[in-house]
Structures are given as C-alpha cells and as structure tokens.
Amino acid sequence: MAWRPGERGAPASRPRLALLLLLLLLPLPSGAWYKHVASPRYHTVGRAAGLLMGLRRSPYLWRRALRAAAGPLARDTLSPEPAAREAPLLLPSWVQELWETRRRSSQAGIPVRAPRSPRAPEPALEPESLDFSGAGQRLRRDVSRPAVDPAANRLGLPCLAPGPF
C-alpha cells in the first residue's frame, strides 16, 4: 500500500510515532543517586555526608557547645575593659608554652629563632675537591666531531647515530 496525497493517517501518525519513541527513550524517574538509603538521619552529599555521618547530634548543637567553650566573642575582646582583653585562650599547653617563651624573649630584646634540627649539617663542597679538568675537552670533542653512521642511509648521506662511535 503506497501513501497517496489525499489519504489521511499516514503523514499525521509519523510525528506522533516519533514523539512516542522519544518519550520511551527517556528514563523513568528514580531517587537521587547521592542520598543515603540507610537512615533518614544521614545527610545527603550536598550537606557533606562524609563529614557529618559519624555525628550523633545535630551540627547546630555542637557548634553552640564549641562557641560556649571558646569564651567571649571576638567583639567582646575589642572592648576597652582589661578583663575582657586578658581572657585566656584555650590552646594546648605546649602551644601556650611556646607563646609565653616567644613573648618573654621578645620583651627582653632577644631575637627569637626556631630550634635547629637534630640532624648534622652537611659539609660544604670546597673548590679544590671539585674536578673540572676534563669537562671542557669532552665538550669540545663532542661538538667538533659528531658521531655519524654513513651506512645507515641508502643514499650514502651521513646520519647522526644514536650512540658514540
């Protein structure tokens, strides 16, 4: 059966058929690939799941706890009252010791330097231990007479060889 210009159905059904096939190619809706299925308390990747999965409390709760343990806020430290400015920082003991040592030595006018490493210093090379006597001659020989292999080319023209001859 051939299609005739006066017949209905064939040309109009072709675009519909193409649209139907295109819709069949579209994937079915599914859950987001980045969400954890284990439990609703886990966050998605968009909310840093790897960092927050181990926490049992809300991040807002532990942020409040950290803020309370840190002492006065930064705007309180700018106040002219000496008690607010001299509030101790909550640093590890070894950091506080280093800070106090640096502060005492800078008040005394002593320059502060980092401690030297326990490794012994490497000896410096002295000029007489370096031998450059044959370096210039080898360089001149390599430049003036390059290694060639005349048999490598069928035309008989010399070619640079990969190794010294």
UniProtKB/Swiss-Prot annotation:
Major localization listed first in the record, in broad terms: secreted
Ranges of Low complexity composition bias in the record: 113-127
Residue ranges the record assigns to the propeptide: 65-165
UniProtKB keywords: Cleavage on pair of basic residues, Glycoprotein, Neuropeptide, Proteoglycan, Secreted, Signal
Pfam hit, one: NPBW
MF terms (GO), sorted A to Z: G protein-coupled receptor binding
Glycosylated residues (UniProt): 133
One Gene Ontology biological process: neuropeptide signaling pathway
Cellular localisation: Secreted
UniProt keyword Signal, yes or no: yes
Tissue: Detected in cerebrospinal fluid and urine (at protein level). Detected at high levels in the substantia nigra, fetal kidney and trachea; at lower levels in testis, uterus, ovary and placenta. Not detectable in many regions of the central nervous system. Also detected at high levels in lymphoblastic leukemia and colorectal adenocarcinoma.
Cleavable signal peptide: 1-32
Cellular component annotations (GO), alphabetically ordered: extracellular region
Domain of life: Eukaryota
Disordered: annotated segments: 106-165
Family of the protein in this entry: Belongs to the neuropeptide B/W family.
Role description: Plays a regulatory role in the organization of neuroendocrine signals accessing the anterior pituitary gland. Stimulates water drinking and food intake. May play a role in the hypothalamic response to stress. NPW23 activates GPR7 and GPR8 more efficiently than NPW30.
Protein name in the entry: Neuropeptide W
Species this protein is from: Homo sapiens
Gene from which this protein is expressed: NPW
